[in-house]
Amino acid sequence: MDINNKFKNTKSQFIYKSGLLSGYVAHRLDNNQNIKRYLCYPTLNPLGDEGLKLNSEIIQQRNITESLLDRYIFDSMFNESMEELHESQIYIHTYRGRSDGEWGEIYIAINILIPLTYEKLANFGEKRSFAIATEIEDMFQDICVAKDNAEKHLIEKLGNLKFKIMQFDNGRLSKTNNVVVNTIILKTGVSTTRLEW
């Protein structure tokens, strides 16, 4: 008997789920109205009904109903050698994974990129990159994502999830540009058990 027969008609889950997780996180961020406002409105008060731009122009700031995926929120890595950035953006990608048998850990990197001119907000000392990072922390830190409170089609493939923020870093993209980068590393555990296919 072939020792691999027990794996016939089964599919490994670890790397497969790793690829789905960044898309899941991007989808969740795209459904957060505050994050969408921080990304779309380059004003000093993006959560208000009216916003004050840097040139003192007042604009109307309505809720954003359209998806920001592939416009402001990207399920991919960013170009680390970019010289300029004219609008705020978020990039999400699977950072790494580790497995020790039937259980694995997957790390997701969320990179928040903000042009330095848009970093400051009206509230004393508040910064756009940290405001977005705080929204992400509130969405994911120690929150169990189960079938009853998430996108059903993704959770059916991923299983119940619990995220933890492992670290964050804040700095400039490079010494020669004015792009602020706030990187958050999320961790979640996934089953690596092979499933029948």
Model-derived features with residue positions:
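Short, flexible/disordered intra-domain loops and linkers
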Residues: 7, 120-127
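Hydrophobic residues positioned within well-ordered beta-strands of beta-sheet architectures
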Residues: 90, 106-110, 182-186
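Beta-strand elements of well-folded, non-transmembrane domains
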Residues: 96-98, 112-118, 188-194
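Acidic-leaning, charged glycine-interspersed low-complexity segments
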Residues: 129-191
